[in-house]
Amino acid sequence: MSSSLPLRDDGALRGSLMLAVFTLFGLGLAYSLVATGITGALFSEQATGSLVRVDARVVGSALVAQPFTDARYFQPRPSAAKYDLTAASGSNQARSNPDLLARIAATRAQVAKRDGIAPEAVPGELLTQSGSGLDPHLSPAGAQVQIRRVAAARGLPEQRVAALVQAATEAPQFGLLGQPRVNVLALNLALDKAGNGESGRDNGVKQAY
């Protein structure tokens, strides 16, 4: 008499269901909650977006660039996304693209006139857009070419503004990763604290959230 395999194996079915439940709740829910809790406890500032507050009011994020049009402020890199957090992107234009070359030429002339420097002295980062369009940093050189304009607009000595730039310059992470950089929002808020910036009022610092 021949034997046949059972059409239904309750033990295997039960094991599959238990594995599915564990995967769903154990890895999908519990792991996420634990990871979120640990992150919030150890890195509370970063976990909430590295928000920057002035007088308990959120004025932006240390991780996201925002536009500054007032001459009293250092200005960030150009943005293809127009500094819109929901539209982060670069232009994706090739270096040979005529539109890109024309825009760079126009921006070079604009920045040179704005900051009172020779066109060839304009750093490349002030002409080109970052990959995300939201890069919050400048190189020290990108900030230094703006010192004269900012100092004149605020009635501050250039040496005072230069010292603020130096103080705001961050070293490479762990001394190895990246390049020296200046967070534009942090520098502009430091300027307001230094004076002639009407800090806490209509100070040109856009509330990003």
Swiss-Prot record:
It is a single-pass membrane protein. The keyword Membrane applies. It comes from the Bacteria. InterPro entries: KdpC. The chain crosses the membrane at residues 18-38. Belongs to the KdpC family. NCBIfam families: kdpC, PRK00315.1. Part of the high-affinity ATP-driven potassium transport (or Kdp) system, which catalyzes the hydrolysis of ATP coupled with the electrogenic transport of potassium into the cytoplasm. This subunit acts as a catalytic chaperone that increases the ATP-binding affinity of the ATP-hydrolyzing subunit KdpB by the formation of a transient KdpB/KdpC/ATP ternary complex. This is Potassium-transporting ATPase KdpC subunit. The gene is kdpC.
